[in-house]
Each structure stands twice: as C-alpha cells, then as structure tokens.
C-alpha cells in the first residue's frame, strides 16, 4: 500500500499552498478564510501614529474640560444635568475617543489571544484530518473524488515513503518522561489540557471543577507534573482509587496514592473481647513484635482498660486593654451560673457537642480559654471549633472591648508536645493493664520478670527523665499509634500528643508475675469524618467493629477505638522491652527489618 508523506507544517497558517502540494479540502478552505482576521486599524486610511495621537489628545483634553465645567457647576450650585452645546459636543467627543481607544487596543489585545488559540486548534484539527485523509485515500483504488477535490499527482521530487510512528526526541529520552497518562479516546483533548497546565494557562487546582471527572483530573495533573519537573512518577499508582471520595474533604490536587502495607497483630484479648489490630507500616519487625506481645497478653488471660476522660479541646486567645479586664472575663467564664449560659450557646453547634468545662490562663492582658467538650464518635476538632466560635460571638456582645486574636491560641494544644495535654488530657485518656505470668514471660517473651522491671525503671523512667522527656516515658508507643492511625484513617499528625505514654512494670505475686500498664492521657481518635470514610480505612475500622457512628450510644465506637490503641501499645511495649532485656533487639531487626540484598551490598 502506497502512503504519501505529509509535508511539514509551516510555522503559521497561510492563505495559499505552493504548487505541487495537495489541494485544500472544503473544510480547510473555509478555515483559511476564517483565519484572515481583521484588526481595528484596518478601517482607517491614516497612519496609526496620527489617529492614535489625535484620539489620545481628544480624550485627555475633553476630559479636562468636562471636569473643569463640573467643578464650576458645583461651586455655583448649578444642576449637573443642565448642559450647554459645547458640553454636549465635549461629551460626544469623549465617547468617540473612548470607543476608538477601546476598539483599537482592547479588541486587538483580545484578538491576539483568540487568534492564537484558534490557530492552535486549527493546526490540531488539520493534523487529525490529514491522518484520516491519508488512511482513507490509501484504502481506495480510484481518485479521491468523493472529497470534492481534484486529484493532483505528487510532485516528482516528493519521495514515497512509508509512515512510521514518531520517535521520541533525544531530550525526552534523556529526561525519561513516560508517555502521557491519558486514555486513547480522549488523548487529543487531554493533551491540550496538559499543555495548558504546563504553560500555566490553566491552574492545576481547577481541573476537578472544570472537567467534572476526578480521576481524569488526577491523571492529567500527574502527567503535567512529570513534564514540568522532568521526573518520572511511574511508580506512583493512579488506578484503583476512588478520587471522588476525597474531593473537598481529604486531599487537594491528587496525583495518585501511596501504598503502605497493612499487617495484622493479634488476637488482642482486651476486656474479654478479641481484636485483630490492623497496622499500616513500612518498618519490619513492628507487626511481628506487637503480635508477640498480644500472644503474651492472651496467654495470661487478657488485658483490661479504663477510660478516664473524654473531651476534645480548643483554646482561643483574646486580648483586652488591661490585665484587669482580662481577669474580669476569666471570673465571668468560671462562674457556675454564667457557665450554664455559655454551655447552652456552645451546644447549639451540634447535637453531639457538649461543653464540659472551660480552663482559663492569663498572660498579661491576654486571656486563653481552653474549652473542653465531648464530640460523640468524631475526633471533634471541627465540632469544638464551631462551638467556640458561637461562644466568642456571644462574649463579644458582653465585652465589646474584647479583641479576638485567634480561635486557636496553642493552649489547646493540637499537634504539638505540650504539658497541658500530658497533665489535663486531650481527647480520650486511657489506662490499660495486664498481669503476665512468670511462665509466659519465660516461654513467650524469653526473659525474666526482674530484668524487665529493672530495665523499665532505668530506661523508660530514669532515662526519659535524664532526656527531659515530655510524655515520652515509654519504649516506642509512637510506633504502634502511628501504624494504627494510618490504617484506620486517623490524623497522623496527632500522633504527637496521642503517643504521650508512661509505661509501668512491677513484680507482683511474690515477684513471680509481671504487672505492666500504659497510661495515655491524650488519644485523639474518631470513627466518623476525615479519612475514616475512605474504603481501605473503613474496612480496617470494620475489622475492629468500630466503623461509623454508634446510634445507640453515641461516642462509644470512638472510645472503644481509643482503648484498642492503648491495648496495642501495651502489647508493643511488652514485646520490645522483652527483646531489649534478652539482648534480641539487634538480632530480630537484622532478620526482619533489613534487606539481605542491602547487607550484601554493604559488605562487598
């Protein structure tokens, strides 16, 4: 089959084609006529510098004349709508000059963009139609009379060569950019959008709203990012995720998702019930170690937990002119009668929010009010913030000189290690304990009770005190908290205060058995809202039996999840401390937490 070689596309569309080239098809003839755009200056025979100067002079002189007349009328108390003939002429001249200037500069400016976009679209349409024309022409034996064109033989100098797929340029090969991540059916349209994003014509954040397809928007954004940075994102998966589920609530401008393996530790026997604990982590040996701790707890009869407090906090900062006025508001807020009024205002924000107390602190003329409230099965940051805003609006009427500096004054304290959380608690305060028998300590944990007690005192208590730890009197509570948080859709940043933990170990029953406990004053979890509604995280919550909100006892699912977190931390602490006590830490990590391939490379 003979295939014609298409001549190279000129830099800009032209009105005529050189002799020997293929004739224009009817739709291209109309397209060439449309490309002959008029500009505003074509209607005037005078040189542009004369007409421009004339109308610029007319505009400014007439404007000055009208403003002067306007000022005189104001001084003489003359009605502005009474105009003379000269003023009518001036107004007409002003309108004429404005029309000319807008027509010349405004239309020309717009046409410069419109014509450029139209030309680009014309060339894209021409490329597509040319390829289709060549394929249709090759499939016919007779001349192409059905297209309304006269068959013109190719020029003698034009060689007949087979068409081959375009090869990637050397620059593209060096940058190792993958092919555009678009579907064949929409490749041309998506390619134009990708170019617009790369060139900065279309904001990347607006793709979802303009396309109406979240997955397609993520695909286009990912390809545009590869072209902008020159870095390959081939290993970042795009398929297999519901991007509609994160729109407007979990993540902005997505380009894919990160895969984190999820392991199962357990069964964890806690308060008479068994739980298989999902842990999302990339640290080898972590799940295995926690699983061993669960085994030791199970073999010893299980663990028990107690919920001490349940209240999310938010602490706005307000300022007064004097410290005395700040103290007056402090006394007002702490008054039991006034508190009932503030609680009623606060509780209007949600049917689950219930204000429990307000803790105040003064720094000069600044007052920090730490609101504590229950939030049902939600983690509750948005809920408590909304309630605090209602109270601030109410107090603004009572204290008009109160200046609200910010709805969060860091006396909360969120996503930061703070003594106020360690002492007063934030979220769920839980203590979890278990008695591990001597037999289990020796057979499962491979250590001795006395060795564990001594190590805990010197490491978790004395060592942490020497380091000036704030809530870090434990071995690795953060490891377990982070893994469970990621698996169940919690806020990973709140791992900071949620990992506040003190681990205690004592010998009981005449020194034969081990009493171990973890006290965690600020576990911040929820079973509704945020990442808990995503498919994978929702499945992990369902595995624990705490998916969604509990309709019968609001808040019970979130409280149960907090106790499961504490029980998992107890298992992790027990296993790691045993490994350190028995001298097995390095051996186990070299076996489970380090690649054999990496060890070989390091030794060679």
Curated annotation (Swiss-Prot):
Glycans are attached at residues 347, 460, 593. One of its GO terms (cellular component) is endoplasmic reticulum membrane. Residues 1-31 are annotated as: Disordered. One of its GO terms (molecular function) is hydroxymethylglutaryl-CoA reductase (NADPH) activity. InterPro entries: HMG_CoA_Rdtase, HMG_CoA_Rdtase_cat_sf, HMG_CoA_Rdtase_CS, HMG_CoA_Rdtase_eu_arc, HMG_CoA_Rdtase_N, HMG_CoA_Rdtase_NAD(P)-bd_sf, HMG_CoA_Rdtase_sub-bd_dom_sf. Pathway: Metabolic intermediate biosynthesis; (R)-mevalonate biosynthesis; (R)-mevalonate from acetyl-CoA: step 3/3. Induction: In leaves, by wounding, elicitation, bacterial or fungal infection. The chain crosses the membrane at residues 40-62, 90-110. It is a multi-pass membrane protein. Residues 111-189 are annotated as: Linker. Keywords: Endoplasmic reticulum, Glycoprotein, Isoprene biosynthesis, Membrane, NADP, Oxidoreductase, Transmembrane, Transmembrane helix. It is an enzyme of class 1 (oxidoreductase). Pfam families: HMG-CoA_red. GO terms for biological process: coenzyme A metabolic process; isoprenoid biosynthetic process; sterol biosynthetic process. It catalyses: (R)-mevalonate + 2 NADP(+) + CoA = (3S)-3-hydroxy-3-methylglutaryl-CoA + 2 NADPH + 2 H(+). Its EC number is 1.1.1.34. Gene3D superfamilies: 3-hydroxy-3-methylglutaryl-coenzyme A Reductase, Chain A, domain 2, HMGR, N-terminal domain, Hydroxymethylglutaryl-CoA reductase, class I/II, NAD/NADP-binding domain. The active site is at residues 283, 415, 491, 589. Residues 190-604 are annotated as: Catalytic. Belongs to the HMG-CoA reductase family. NCBIfam families: HMG_CoA_R_NADP (TIGR00533). This is 3-hydroxy-3-methylglutaryl-coenzyme A reductase. It comes from Nicotiana sylvestris.
């Amino acid at each position: 089959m003979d295939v014609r070689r298409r001549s190279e596309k000129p830099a800009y569309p032209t009105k005529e084609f050189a002799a020997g080239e293929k004739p224009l098809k009817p739709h291209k003839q109309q397209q060439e006529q449309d490309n002959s755009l008029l500009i505003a200056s074509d209607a005037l025979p005078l040189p542009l510098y004369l007409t421009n100067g004339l109308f610029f002079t007319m505009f400014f002189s007439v404007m000055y004349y009208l403003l002067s007349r306007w000022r005189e009328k104001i001084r003489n108390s003359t009605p502005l709508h009474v105009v003379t003939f000269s003023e009518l002429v001036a107004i007409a001249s002003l309108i004429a000059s404005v029309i000319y200037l807008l027509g010349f500069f405004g239309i020309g400016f717009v046409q410069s963009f419109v014509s450029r976009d139209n030309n680009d679209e014309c060339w894209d349409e021409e490329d597509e139609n040319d390829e289709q024309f060549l394929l249709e022409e090759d499939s016919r034996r007779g001349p192409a009379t059905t297209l309304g064109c006269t068959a013109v033989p190719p020029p003698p100098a034009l060689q007949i060569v087979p068409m081959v797929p375009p090869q990637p340029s050397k620059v593209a090969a060096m940058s190792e950019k993958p092919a555009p991540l678009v579907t064949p059916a929409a490749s041309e349209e998506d390619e134009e959008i990708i170019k617009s994003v790369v060139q900065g014509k279309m904001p990347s954040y607006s793709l979802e709203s303009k396309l109406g397809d979240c997955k397609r928007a993520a695909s286009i954004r990912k390809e545009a990012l590869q072209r902008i940075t020159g870095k390959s994102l081939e290993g970042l998966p795009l398929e297999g995720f519901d991007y509609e589920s994160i729109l407007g609530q979990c993540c902005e401008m997505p380009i894919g998702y990160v895969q984190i393996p999820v392991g199962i530790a357990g069964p964890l026997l806690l308060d008479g019930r068994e739980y298989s604990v999902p842990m999302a982590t990339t640290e080898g040996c972590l799940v295995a170690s926690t699983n061993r701790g669960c085994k030791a707890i199970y073999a010893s009869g299980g663990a028990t937990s107690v919920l001490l407090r349940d209240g999310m906090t938010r602490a706005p900062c307000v300022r007064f002119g004097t410290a005395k006025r700040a103290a007056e508001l402090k006394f007002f807020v702490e008054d039991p009668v006034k508190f009932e009024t503030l609680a009623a205002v606060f509780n209007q924000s949600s049917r689950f929010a219930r204000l429990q107390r307000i803790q105040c602190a003064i720094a000069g003329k600044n007052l920090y009010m730490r609101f504590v409230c229950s939030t049902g099965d939600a983690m509750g940051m948005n809920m408590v913030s909304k309630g605090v805003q209602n109270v601030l609006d109410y107090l603004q009427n009572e204290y008009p000189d109160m200046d609200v500096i910010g709805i969060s004054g860091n006396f909360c304290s969120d996503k930061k290690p703070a003594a106020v959380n360690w002492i007063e608690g934030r979220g769920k305060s839980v203590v979890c304990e278990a008695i591990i028998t001597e037999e289990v300590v020796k057979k499962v944990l491979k250590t001795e009770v006395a060795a564990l007690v001594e190590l805990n005192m010197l490491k978790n208590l004395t060592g942490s005190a020497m380091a000036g730890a704030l809530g870090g009197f434990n071995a690795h509570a953060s490891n377990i908290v982070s893994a469970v948080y990621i698996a169940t859709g919690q806020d990973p940043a709140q791992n900071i205060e949620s990992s506040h933990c003190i681990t205690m170990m004592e010998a009981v029953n005449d020194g034969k058995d081990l009493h171990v406990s973890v006290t965690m004053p600020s576990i911040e979890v929820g079973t509704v809202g945020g990442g808990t509604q995503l498919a994978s995280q929702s499945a992990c919550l369902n595995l624990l039996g705490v998916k969604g909100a509990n309709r019968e006892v609001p808040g019970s699912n979130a409280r149960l999840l907090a106790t499961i977190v504490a029980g998992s931390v107890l298992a992790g602490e027990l296993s790691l401390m045993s490994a350190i006590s028995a001298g097995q830490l390095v051996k186990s990590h070299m076996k489970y937490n380090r690649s054999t391939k990496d060890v070989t490379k390091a030794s060679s």
